[in-house]
Regions:
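Histidine-centered catalytic/metal-coordination loop motif
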Residues: 70
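Conserved short beta-strand edge segments in small beta-sheet-based binding/regulatory domains
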Residues: 73-86
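Short S/T/G/P-rich N-terminal loop/turn motif that feeds into the first structured element of a domain
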Residues: 1-51, 59-66, 83-86
């Protein structure tokens, strides 16, 4: 299991679609529908920067990147391995 921080950035024209994806992923987490081993820990949106920072637990970085490929959010995203201190 790894802890990840994922930074998403979108263009203004993609904002509505980006928020649809965020909403559906949050609903999947709330309803226990994410694939086994994946947990969305937090979502922080900085709207005036068209950015979201999400914290995840996942089986591996590669598994998470595979999930991102399937979801295909309308964002540019960076995935960072992180160490949770608090």
């Amino acid at each position: 299991m790894v802890s990840l921080v994922v930074e998403h950035r979108w263009k203004e024209k993609n904002a509505q679609d980006a928020f649809k994806v965020v909403g559906s992923i949050i609903d999947m987490q709330k309803n226990g529908k994410l694939p086994s081993g994946f947990t969305l820990k937090s979502v922080n949106v900085v709207e005036n920067e068209r950015m979201a920072v999400c914290e995840w637990d996942a089986p591996s970085v590669d598994d998470f990147k595979g999930l991102l490929e399937k979801v295909n959010p309308p964002t540019k995203h960076e995935v960072y391995l992180s160490k949770r201190l608090l």
